[in-house]
Amino acid sequence: IIMQPIIDLDLKNFQLQDIKITSPFMAKAIMALFSALIVCFPYIIFEIYSFIYPAISKISKIYLVFIFIFSVSFFFVGCIFGYSFLLPISISFFVRLIDDSVIFAPERLNYIFYSFWLILVCGLIYQLPIISLILTKLKILNYEFLKQMRSYAIVIFLVLGAILSPPDPLSQLLLAIPLYVLYELGIFISYIFREK
């Protein structure tokens, strides 16, 4: 499954390679580790939820259920976005940089690590609205502060888009726009759950 973005590009003279003698084993181990992290994320969140649940009030328990459901959902939406959208864009960008006289043969271990890193980062970035909700309920952040910081957030998202995506304006915007939408969703959630 993780090789599908490369297969879809239908590259000529392309093959992944294992340079070190331990690379085949390490590739499978890293795939297993990252796959386990992605699949176990709901369980990790559930364990945190179970630890906190007995010590809070009934109203807070309702918030906690809401946070749990949305946290898991947003994580998987982020992972899907990273895998189906951002990973193919970044691979096609790197492939475009290759000279015709060069055979594109990246190390399999490097490709697997890069792919899973990108997918996990997207999943974690999609936790922004949940983080806004938690920090609002803990009275660390408030709706007004998030609203005031909107212009700074836009700049930060554009910079992150430039760093994490290929250096063309379209890819930068394709990463920055979802981040901005998540930020606005965080502001909206913070507004709904603000202290009245």
Q: How does the language model describe each region?
A:
Residues 1-196:
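Membrane topogenic/interface segments and analogous intrinsically disordered interaction regions
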